[in-house]
Design a protein with these regions (language model features):
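C-terminal helical subdomain
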Residues: 173, 180-247
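Catalytic loop of short-chain dehydrogenase/reductase
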Residues: 114-128, 139-177, 189-194
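Conserved glycine-rich Rossmann-like NAD(P)H-binding loop of the short-chain dehydrogenase/reductase
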Residues: 36-51
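Conserved mid-core segment of classical short-chain dehydrogenase/reductases
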Residues: 99-116
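N-terminal Rossmann-fold NAD(P) dinucleotide-binding loop
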Residues: 25-26
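Rossmann-fold cofactor-recognition segment
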Residues: 56-75
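Flexible N-terminal pre-Rossmann segment of NAD(P)-dependent oxidoreductases
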Residues: 1-17, 241-247
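Conserved glycine-rich cofactor-binding loop
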Residues: 21-22
Length: 247
């Protein structure tokens, strides 16, 4: 993946990106590394970590830290963040493109395994990372909850995805009220994303590189937390201009 988007300097910032090995996460990892940050990405295995390092190529500098950690439950996320604090001294920013896609059944056709996999497990992973990382984050940083278009568009056969994504939207709203500006939390609302997994890319689609650039620019800015719509390439370009002006 090529990325010619300029990034503000974030030298010394310590960034956690659970889900960083995925298509959207890759863009965030590349962008924060390009900005000079220390980037922590949890992986399921050493083999997966090596595959991701090879994928990144020259972008995988010494500032990339691949931790073999399962962060999908409360204990695992707590251990991950504790390890990051122990090794890097703290946490400044978190970008959480956690999740996947699920399709195939109408709501009344699902079984308990579907419910656990497509709703409970993903919501738990987001909550686990948030509760472990947010209290430890510095005030200069930002937390990014990442959701897809299913959060506000009902998709037949993928209702559990829409329900889980909408829950994350409410998580962001509750955090805004509870934090009262003490720390910054952004909600990135994505449309269809052009990633390494997409063969036929629509030129109007937002790219993972743009999403990463928006997160980096928001991290570097003084803009309070907010909801940022990145449903297409044009909205991403507008967000970069708006957030850049707040630096």
């Amino acid at each position: 993946m090529s990325d010619s988007i300029p990034h503000p300097a974030l030298s010394g910032r310590r960034v956690l990106i659970p889900g960083g090995t995925g298509g959207v996460g890759e863009g965030a990892v590349r962008s924060y590394l390009a900005a000079g940050a220390q980037v922590v990405v949890p992986t399921r295995s050493k083999e997966r970590a090596e595959e991701f390092r090879l994928l990144l190529g020259e972008a995988a500098t010494a500032r990339l830290h691949l931790f073999e950690h399962d962060y999908t439950d409360f204990a695992g996320a707590e251990a991950l963040v504790a390890t990051m604090v122990d090794r890097l001294g703290g946490v400044d920013d978190v970008v959480a493109p956690i999740g996947g896609w699920w399709h195939g059944k109408r709501l009344w056709e699902i079984d308990e395994a579907d419910w656990q996999a497509a709703f409970v497990s993903l919501a738990t992973a987001h909550m686990a990372v948030l509760r472990a990382a947010l209290p430890r984050m510095t005030r200069q940083g930002a937390y990014f909850i990442v959701v897809g278009e299913a959060a506000h568009v009902p998709i037949p056969g993928s209702g559990l995805v829409s329900m889980e994504q909408t829950a994350l939207q409410m998580m962001h709203q509750v955090l805004a009220v509870e934090l009262q500006g003490a720390k910054r939390v952004f909600l990135l609302e994505l449309g269809p994303v052009a990633t390494r997994f997409v063969e036929a890319v629509d030129p109007a689609q937002v790219t993972s590189a743009q999403i990463g650039a928006v997160a980096v620019t928001a991290s570097a800015s003084t803009r309070p937390g907010s909801s940022v719509r990145l449903l297409n390439r044009a909205q991403a370009e507008e967000a970069l201009v708006s957030l850049g002006a707040a630096r």
